[in-house]
Amino acid sequence: MEVKAIHRGARISAQKTRLVADQIRGLPIERALNVLTFSPKKAAGIVKKVVESAIANAEHNEGADIDELKVKSIFVDKATSLKRFTARAKGRGNRIEKQTCHITVTLGN
């Protein structure tokens, strides 16, 4: 049995999120949540919400036992960038790209 949760358009770069995702890949649920809870990174809070959503999906949709679940796969894909402008000297402007990503978590036995 596999259960998925996806967060699309998370307002953080994929590169920063992958650092957190690599830490919990393959871990049991309880241990993964502990790692995410005590991590100081912004991405940890976002990934934790996605993992908790996947746990809720497993309980509600599949009636699964949470204690047996582990993070079967987690991957982070780059999403579209938000284009913004910032003012520069002499009336000029530079483009800023605010990165977004898609986070996909799959839980299984």
UniProtKB/Swiss-Prot annotation:
InterPro entries: Ribosomal_uL22, Ribosomal_uL22_bac/chlpt-type, Ribosomal_uL22_bac/org-type, Ribosomal_uL22_CS, Ribosomal_uL22_sf. One of its GO terms (biological process) is translation. The keyword Ribonucleoprotein applies. Keywords: Ribonucleoprotein, Ribosomal protein, RNA-binding, rRNA-binding. One of its GO terms (molecular function) is structural constituent of ribosome. The keyword Repeat does not apply. It holds the Pfam family Ribosomal_L22. SUPFAM superfamilies: Ribosomal protein L22. This protein binds specifically to 23S rRNA; its binding is stimulated by other ribosomal proteins, e.g. L4, L17, and L20. It is important during the early stages of 50S assembly. It makes multiple contacts with different domains of the 23S rRNA in the assembled 50S subunit and ribosome. The globular domain of the protein is located near the polypeptide exit tunnel on the outside of the subunit, while an extended beta-hairpin is found that lines the wall of the exit tunnel in the center of the 70S ribosome. NCBIfam families: rplV_bact (TIGR01044). HAMAP family: Ribosomal_uL22_B. Belongs to the universal ribosomal protein uL22 family. Part of the 50S ribosomal subunit. This is Large ribosomal subunit protein uL22. The lineage of its organism: Bacteria, Pseudomonadati, Pseudomonadota, Betaproteobacteria, Burkholderiales.
